Amino acid sequence: MKSSELHRRFIKAGYKFDHAEGSHYFYIKDGVMTEPIPYHGAKEMGTGIANKLIRKYGIDGEGEQF
């Protein structure tokens, strides 16, 4: 999965961009901030980290929260 696709899923699931530190973005939802989410544009993200973040924050393939 491309890094930009993961970030689109976070936004679609209701997370709001809070701030960036270098190449890592932080999102916030219901007053809770996410851990740093790596952002490298169109580059492929490792499946392990992508799957970990999807499971941890409950985001399915369409960006909806489950």
Language-model features and meaning:
Residues 14-20:
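Short secondary-structure junctions
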Residues 1, 36-37:
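Short, contiguous strand/loop micro-motifs
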Residues 33, 40-66:
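C-terminal structural segments of small proteins and small subunits
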Residues 1-14:
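Polyanion-binding surface elements
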Residues 27-31:
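Active-site beta-strand termini and strand-to-loop segments that position acidic
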Residues 10, 32-33:
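Generic signal for short, ordered secondary-structure residues
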